[in-house]
Amino acid sequence: MRVVILGAGMAGLLAAKALAENNVEYTLFDKNPREGASNNPGLHYLHDSCGLPLEPKIVFNYIIGCKDGELPHEQYSRKLGTPLNNSLVNLPAYNIVYNFQDAYDILLHRYGKKVQHLKIVPSMMGSLLERYDKVISTIPLPVLFPEAKCEHIEVQAVKGRPFPTPILPGDNQVVYNIDENVNWYRYSRVFGVEWTEVKQGGDFTIKKVVDTNFHSPNDRVILLGRWGSWNRKFLAHHSYYETLRRLSKW
């Protein structure tokens, strides 16, 4: 079995972990080896340890700025211009999470030596399918399939908290502000790192995918991760378990 993984961010490295644990040889390509997605601005955490030696933490979720008679996800959608099926639909009071950066560092230490430099373009698909039995892609979907309809919205982020708005004390919390008259919409303090995400005027740009209906046209090409599948609900840890599931059928 010859397998290639495109992208060495969190999703790609978790796919590599699943393959390595099952003694499947693989090649791992990335256009920027040893950078991955760990340096991206904004809120990041893992929902599952995927067998890594990580300590679970509880992150509490809060919503402020609600209008009477309106559901939070509706107000949030209008404020950001996102679809109604957004993060505030059935938002739990808390999540049990794991440190994203620690996980990435462990994975990079284990599998980083396998990463080879290669910038993928759509014309490479034919040669990849000739050389490999399976292609696992975690890179942005339109890079591999430009015909896919891949929309996104852009917001901004700044480090720190939204002064002078009062924030609950303590670590490991996420506060959503859905008041449409306030620029910031999410504040997070998770694992000691603070971010405030705003509609405009930030120091960093964050892209948020708008789900597509595109599916892989070839059963040998497996699309993993939020960006690889262009599905906001495809979280990083899903890449690990989806790879294991696929392996059971190969």
Where are these regions (language model features)?
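Central helical "cap/lid" subdomain
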Residues: 36-37, 122-182
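Glycine-rich FAD pyrophosphate-binding loop
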Residues: 20-40
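Beta1/beta-strand and adjacent pyrophosphate-binding region of the FAD-binding site
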Residues: 1-11
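Conserved flavin/dinucleotide-binding core of flavoenzymes
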Residues: 34, 184-250
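Helical element adjacent to the flavin cofactor pocket in flavoenzyme catalytic cores
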Residues: 84-134, 138-142
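A short, Lys/Arg-enriched amphipathic alpha-helix followed by its capping loop at the start of a domain
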Residues: 3, 15-24
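Conserved beta-strand elements of the Class I
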Residues: 4, 59-62, 222
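Dinucleotide-binding Rossmann-like beta1-alpha1 core, especially the glycine-rich loop
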Residues: 33-34, 38-91
